[in-house]
Amino acid sequence: MSNIWSKEETLWSFALYGTAVGAGTLFLPIQLGSAGAVVLFITALVAWPLTYWPHKALCQFILSSKTSAGEGITGAVTHYYGKKIGNLITTLYFIAFFVVVLIYAVAITNSLTEQLAKHMVIDLRIRMLVSLGVVLILNLIFLMGRHATIRVMGFLVFPLIAYFLFLSIYLVGSWQPDLLTTQVEFNQNTLHQIWISIPVMVFAFSHTPIISTFAIDRREKYGEHAMDKCKKIMKVAYLIICISVLFFVFSCLLSIPPSYIEAAKEEGVTILSALSMLPNAPAWLSISGIIVAVVAMSKSFLGTYFGVIEGATEVVKTTLQQVGVKKSRAFNRALSIMLVSLITFIVCCINPNAISMIYAISGPLIAMILFIMPTLSTYLIPALKPWRSIGNLITLIVGILCVSVMFFS
């Protein structure tokens, strides 16, 4: 049996699942619910290939490069395109996931202020205090160290997955099929909704940061056979991810009237908040919903924050060197944490709409790295020509459509 499927492959499947399913899963039903049933059904059809193809392409891109042990995306880009393009991709990578951190922080703040609003009037002063508390607490957890934080995150994965599955099954009793069947119409607005929903889908299913670690680990163990091992794990993991996420999305949208989804979208909160808004929502759902939403987004925040701080440290180091100042790595890192925290606090106070940030900034930037860079490279780099395929071409086209939302939406 171990020759067919090993314990290690099971652990990596859980790692991919735990990284992919989280805060993004809570935003996907909001966008798809407001976009209409046609967009929902199309998403269900394309979810697996548009999760598998881009992550597989990125894995191939990393594994095909002749880089030093332990080098991931940045090393691969530098190998193929040189140091300048490598630095550009590193900066783009930093910006893309810095925006993700901002989205999670804003959504956590909104979820907490929404609960406080039931007991008091929320003005700017209260929002500033909540924003400050969110930023400070998340930083305190982060400063516990990488290993301690990862242990906490790993401990939270299974309860979160169990909650999503339990809630999906629980809501089956409240399904109202007419909530979807009455929305089935295809017109010009449907095409527009499909277009602007692409970045949210990219955001929800993306787990780009772990792909470098995954590819490097497989290469160290299997060498030239690493890609076959990666594809084997990805096919199974992404099938489970897509089935469970789509079951959760359909279960929510078959239970929640569109007006509540629109209200949640306007407030910049997750689908769990939309569920708690329902008149007949049980008390346990409101309480557990806010806890799970905050925990899921905090887990995703911390998982992304490590990479953001590392990227910010490099940006600070380069900037200081350009003005003739050379400081220790500890100083650069401390300054990075302070600057990132300050910007996060300010954005939480301003309260931009989370969904709008996803489809206007975060989704398109992630698409540049995940959908466009590895697939376009198969047409630009002769050594990558064997990886050209219909799947890669479709991934490239979807990536370009996703990026176009940033400029034309």
Curated annotation (Swiss-Prot):
Periplasmic topological segments: 1-25, 109-127, 173-193, 257-276, 351-353
- Chief subcellular location equals membrane
InterPro entries the record matches: Amino_acid_transport_2 (IPR018227)
Localization, UniProt: Cell inner membrane
Q: Which residues cross the membrane?
A: 26-46, 88-108, 128-148, 152-172, 194-214, 236-256, 277-297, 330-350, 354-374, 389-409
Q: Which GO terms describe its cellular component?
A: plasma membrane
The membrane topology term of the UniProt record is: Multi-pass membrane protein
Please tell me whether the keyword Magnesium is annotated for this protein: no
Spans within the Cytoplasmic topological domain: 47-87, 149-151, 215-235, 298-329, 375-388
Record's PANTHER family? INNER MEMBRANE TRANSPORT PROTEIN YQEG (PTHR35334:SF3), SERINE TRANSPORTER (PTHR35334)
Name of the molecule in the record: Inner membrane transport protein YqeG
